[in-house]
Amino acid sequence: MKPKVLLAGGTGYIGKYLSEVIENDAELFAISKYPDNKKTDDVEMTWIQCDIFHYEQVVAAMNQIDIAVFFIDPTKNSAKITQSSARDLTLIAADNFGRAAAINQVKKVIYIPGSRYDNETIERLGAYGTPVETTNLVFKRSLVNVELQVSKYDDVRSTMKVVLPKGWTLKNVVNHFIAWMGYTKGTFVKTEKSHDQFKIYIKNKVRPLAVFKIEETADGIITLILLSGSLVKKYTVNQGKLEFRLIKESAVVYIHLYDYIPRLFWPIYYFIQAPMQKMMIHGFEVDCRIKDFQSRLKSGENMKYTK
């Protein structure tokens, strides 16, 4: 029986090359956020609808796979606007891939090198116990992420990493984020949290800007799923998600917004709402660094705070 091989990055030149080389020796599968646009008669391959940055979709796509091949090009994004570094996108995708491979008991992950972040990527892929091999083939990737691209939907992806304050858990970070938005003057909002939901309001307003469901997606991943509110564009296939991801064996938390389709007219979102969101998350990042500094001082560490 032929092994089942999953290709991440099967839509580009490298994917086409690999699929042609191993077509006769394996049952091929490839993932794409929009697989209907990728089907070809050149190679016998099964396309799976999957966004590599969406943890649960990657886990589902890797079901019954024997070997998984990881290659992504940071210049080819699946969102209309992507505000993130190539490094952060690569590491989030690799973390998803490594987690999914371990859950599905994939025999090995094969990585195609050629990025400045090869060592970090290989570490992420193997962080959950799956063996990782690298190919002799090296394919150089761009170090610059492309912010605006043509996309099926007017969706947004952005990432920011913050430090996990000493002695905190990921749940502490999420709860602090919710509270911080409410008491920080510069955000101009107030927040309410009840059980597994929280709401954001403009101060002195009754109708919420956004209502989120808080969901513990996996160990080390907490997702705030957008349910309703004045910032929500109605009748969209997917609603936005704000994911908090703790990188295993580190003090790094990624805050990842994806699947969000703004209600505002696109240029207004890009030039007004997006910069405000970025400024708010940056403010939270600074606050987390201060909290980490304070926690370390309390524990007796001798250190100086630097911006």
Swiss-Prot record:
It comes from the Bacteria. It comes from Staphylococcus aureus (strain NCTC 8325 / PS 47). Pfam families: Epimerase (PF01370). Homodimer. Interacts with GraR and GraS. Plays a role in resistance against cationic antimicrobial peptides (CAMPs). Facilitates the activation of GraS to transduce the signal to GraR. Transmembrane segments: none annotated. InterPro entries: Epimerase_deHydtase, NAD(P)-bd_dom_sf. This is Auxiliary protein GraX.
